Amino acid sequence: MNQEDNTGGGGIFGLFKWTKDALFGTDISPSMKYKDQEERRDRSRYAQDDTNFSMKFGNDSNRRSTNLSRSNSWSGLDSTLHRKYELLPEYNENGFNSIVNGDHHSKERIRSLRSPAPIVPREPLRNEPTDTFGHRLHTKRRTINELSNSQIPFIPPQEDDPLLSKLFNKDGVNEVRRSPYKLSVKDIPGKFPSPLTKRDEIDNYYVRDEDACHNNREYKKAYFDLFAQMDLNSRDLEDLCEDVREQREQFHRNEQTYKQAYEEMRAELVNELKKSKTLFENYYSLGQKYKSLKKVLDQTISHEAELATSRERLYQEEDLKNFEIQTLKQRLSDLELKYTNLQIEKDMQRDNYESEIHDLLLQLSLRNNERKDTSAGSNIFSTGQYDRTPFHNGNNSYDSNSHSWDTDYLKNIDGFIER
């Protein structure tokens, strides 16, 4: 078993040693050892073996503790260790290996896990039911208010702890608590003596009574029962890890499906937006054309109204002009008729005047002839003189077309008529 411990091999001996050291050899449980540790610790505070030299035993409290560093199970953690022990690599939120992809948060976490864990932390995280006796004895218990900001909710230890009750009888524990002697670390079963312990103390350590040996055998049986239970828990943990891995793969597949659907939906949305933009532009241009056509239509309607008004006015003016034309034509007809009547009347008057003149001239000439005949004899009128009168031209008839009037003679006739 020592060879297995020195070589760092696995198996039941390594598991037994690791569990034993976790329960009794250190001041912190394995569940608390790798939770939320500081990134950088003072490596000189930890020993390189499984002995805690900073513990104080009895009256040796003034003894100077040796500052040594100690390695842990995270030392040398790399991909080879993952393949050797079939460990799952660290994945970031995107589903890739955070160590390979250079995730800063995961690198910090791995660095903190690989750094040595403190044997006696300055501020323990929380009191768990699986804490060892040494941690409960030498560690100040934190209050609930101090643990209120923790990521994991605080669970106070139960009065009847199932793990501790399986190792120890409750009556025995109560009896030890009621004893007047103070419980020391050396009284804890399974505790190995410190290398700095005196030789006589080592000899006394191996000298035990029969009851102590019997109790140790019972404890050993309980240890193996716990190891079997831990083996079952490890198998359940492996199954759980497998389920987690399958769920993670399913999650990544679903995420890829959702991502592809999102990309398709996004592309479709972009196309719809482009179509909507084109439709809006066409609608806007159509609206502008509609406004211009409506404006032209309004102008056309206004022009048509003006044209109808002008046409009506022209029709009225045309009717008025036609009425005036008819009136003028009627007046012209009346004037023409009146002119014709006047012309006829004038012709008749002229004929009457000519006939009267002819009669008067004839009377005058007869009167003159009678006067001459009485005064001068029968030769008063010569033939030549008689022929010069316009009314005595051959057949003693009046020529209406003859214009050779003796104006002086007619003047005398007019003067005679006036007298």
From Swiss-Prot:
Pfam families: BBP1_C, BBP1_N
InterPro entries in the cross-refs: Bbp1_C, Bbp1_N
Keyword line: Coiled coil, Cytoplasm, Cytoskeleton, Phosphoprotein
Tagged with keyword Repeat: no
Signal sequence range: none
Sites of Phosphoserine modification: S29, S73, S115
Sequence segments annotated as region (Disordered): 34-76
Coiled coil: 229-355
Compartments where located: Cytoplasm, Cytoskeleton, Microtubule organizing center, Spindle pole body
TM segment ranges: none
Gene Ontology cellular-component annotations: cytoplasm; spindle pole body
Compositional bias annotation for Low complexity: 64-75
Assembly with partners or alone: Homodimer. Interacts with KAR1, MPS2 and SPC29.
Function: Component of the spindle pole body (SPB) required for insertion of the nascent SPB into the nuclear envelope and for the proper execution of spindle pole body (SPB) duplication. Connects the central plaque of the SPB with the half-bridge. Required for proper localization of CDC5 at the SPB and for proper M-phase progression.
Family (UniProt): Belongs to the BBP1 family.
Protein name as catalogued: Spindle pole component BBP1
Organism whose genome encodes this protein: Saccharomyces cerevisiae (strain JAY291)
